[in-house]
A protein has these predicted regions:
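Beta-propeller blade termini
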Residues: 36-50, 107-116, 150-160, 205-213, ...
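Short glycine/acidic-enriched loop and turn motifs that connect beta-strands
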Residues: 58-64, 128-130, 171-175, 226-231, ...
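Beta-strand-rich domains and repeat architectures in extracellular enzymes and scaffolds
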Residues: 35-74, 105-108
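Hydrophobic strand positions within the blades of repeat-based beta-sheet folds
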Residues: 53-55, 71-74, 89, 106, ...
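A detector of repeated loop/turn-to-beta-strand junctions in beta-rich toroidal repeat architectures
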Residues: 66-70, 83, 121, 128-130, ...
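Blade-edge motifs of beta-propeller repeat domains
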Residues: 2-38, 75-105, 133-154, 180-203, ...
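Acidic/hydrophobic-patterned starts of short beta strands in beta-sheet-rich repeat architectures
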Residues: 47-57, 116-125, 160-169, 215-224, ...
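Beta-propeller domains
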Residues: 200-210, 214-366, 373
């Protein structure tokens, strides 16, 4: 059971021509982003059957070059993820195009089996240069890499032909557009491009995410929008793929809810064949906050269905004021700054994990924490919600001001009905050096006993203020 989160599309922007001469395109049907059910293929770079994890360190130093950026890959095995099993890839790594450069911020990620060989690949950005495809293989990532000649970082099979496509945002014109790069060649070339959506000149495209919400074998697009002249505008819209285009489908809300300015995470909460949409929103300081029922942030689940959203179950905001949820709904808590979905107790339903990086613990301002909402057939409620922080028994470390524990969360899936592992980052740990904590799942959810933490030092480098763990995938 996998999760993915809509991040801003600023990670990768490259302008491209309308067509390109391509190398032979990859063929086959095993494309990671092509959904057969709500369960997305594992992120498994070496094909051993165990989920891997990456930490993208955009501000990492490489050979003395500041903010060159690197990706740390943590390989999974039968015991889960271990900090000891890692691989570091940067632009000085043999076979990776280019070379490490100051402020290039190599990283970001879009994992998918782009060449349909059964190994997960990784699409990364490299500053002002072209994106790079790191191909997976028996030895993992890094044995083969090419420059990607298209644009974007939302990888999916939008045409339903078994081939990976990449969606990107092109804001070079007055009216922005979303462009699909198709028929990707083994050398990173793009056989053809087409404009999938065009903005109206008022709306701006800010982020993209691919997922097969209606489970028809074609990936759909979740599009995050803003407005050119109005800060209190924007939200997330769902566009269902028809194979040759996209049809906008409204996301229905319940009375009193407000999904504008919300972030969205995709994952299976209720255990059926359709991915669900987990919305999180924090107060913005704008007029729309009047309609938003929270001081510190909220989470709502819109269940998926054959038409995109199962409208028979309307989403409801859950806050720290909801019965059963630990803590209090307070200004600055930043509930929902991060979110992930995964089956942490092995019952077939996905738990919803949301970060509370602004939570004050005692006198430690912004020490942070995470909330774990139990997944059910109807979604989530406040009942049986757990909170985890550095003051929780058996969790390494102590609550300190500015740790921002919960600034990023990620779920590493296990085998079917085997509890997944929860990864939580505290990007502000040790004066912004950052760190990551791993909590194994159990029949009662994530457990703190035996949990471990690690940071940049585990990679054999001198830690610096890189906010390690700020980007997990």
């Amino acid at each position: 059971m996998k999760t993915s989160r809509l991040r801003t599309a600023s990670a990768i922007f490259v302008t491209l021509a309308a067509t390109a001469t391509a190398a032979p395109a990859f063929s086959g049907t095993a494309v990671a982003a092509a959904q057969a059910s709500a369960v997305r293929q594992q992120v498994d770079f070496n094909g051993d059957g165990y989920e891997d994890m990456i930490a993208s360190v955009l501000d990492g130093t490489v050979s003395g070059i500041k903010k060159a950026g690197y990706v740390a890959v943590y390989r999974g095995d039968a015991k889960g993820i271990s900090p000891a099993r890692h691989q570091v890839i940067n632009q000085n790594t043999a076979g990776v195009p280019g070379s490490a450069a100051a402020n290039a911020r190599f990283g970001g990620s879009a994992p998918a089996d782009i060449d349909a060989d059964g190994y997960t690949d990784l699409l990364v950005s490299a500053g002002n240069g072209r994106p790079i495809i790191l191909f997976g293989g028996k030895s993992g990532l890094g044995t083969r890499a090419v420059e990607f000649q298209g644009q974007g970082n939302a990888v999916g099979d939008f045409g339903g032909d078994g081939r990976a496509d990449v969606a990107g945002i092109d804001n070079t014109e007055w009216a922005g557009r979303i462009v699909l790069s198709e028929n990707i060649g083994a050398d990173g070339s793009v056989g053809s491009t087409r404009t999938a959506l065009t903005a109206d000149g008022v709306t701006t495209y800010e982020g993209l995410q691919a997922a097969d919400i209606n489970n028809d074998g074609k990936d759909d697009l979740l599009v995050r929008t803003g407005c050119n002249d109005e800060p209190d505008c924007g939200g997330t819209s769902l566009y269902l793929s028809t194979g040759t285009g996209f049809t906008r489908t409204d996301i229905v809300t319940a009375p009193g809810t407000y999904l504008n300015h919300a972030s969205v995470t995709v994952g299976s909460v209720n255990g059926d064949a359709y991915p669900d949409l987990v919305f999180t929103r924090r107060p913005t300081g704008l007029d729309s906050d009047v309609d938003f029922p929270s001081k510190g942030g909220a989470v709502a689940v819109a269940l998926g269905g054959p038409k995109g959203q199962n409208t028979s179950v309307k989403p409801k905001w859950i806050t720290q004021a909801t019965a059963g949820v630990p803590g209090a709904d307070e200004k600055g808590d930043a509930l929902g700054a991060s979110a992930a979905v995964g089956d942490l107790d092995g019952d077939g339903y996905g738990e919803v994990v949301v970060g509370l990086p602004g939570e004050d613990v005692g006198t430690a301002k912004d020490a942070g924490g995470v909330l774990v909402f139990k997944g059910r057939a109807s979604g989530i409620t406040g009942a049986d919600t757990k909170v985890i922080g550095q003051s929780t028994v058996d969790v390494p470390g102590v609550d300190e001001q500015g740790d921002a524990f919960g600034g990023e969360v990620h779920v590493v899936s296990g085998a079917k009905n085997v509890p997944a592992t929860l990864a939580v980052a505290a990007p502000g740990e040790n004066t912004n050096q950052g760190g990551v904590w791993l909590f194994k799942g159990s029949r009662t959810g994530p457990v703190t006993k035996g949990s471990v933490s690690f940071g940049e030092a585990s990679l054999g480098v001198t830690p610096s203020a890189v906010r390690f763990g700020n980007w997990l995938g």
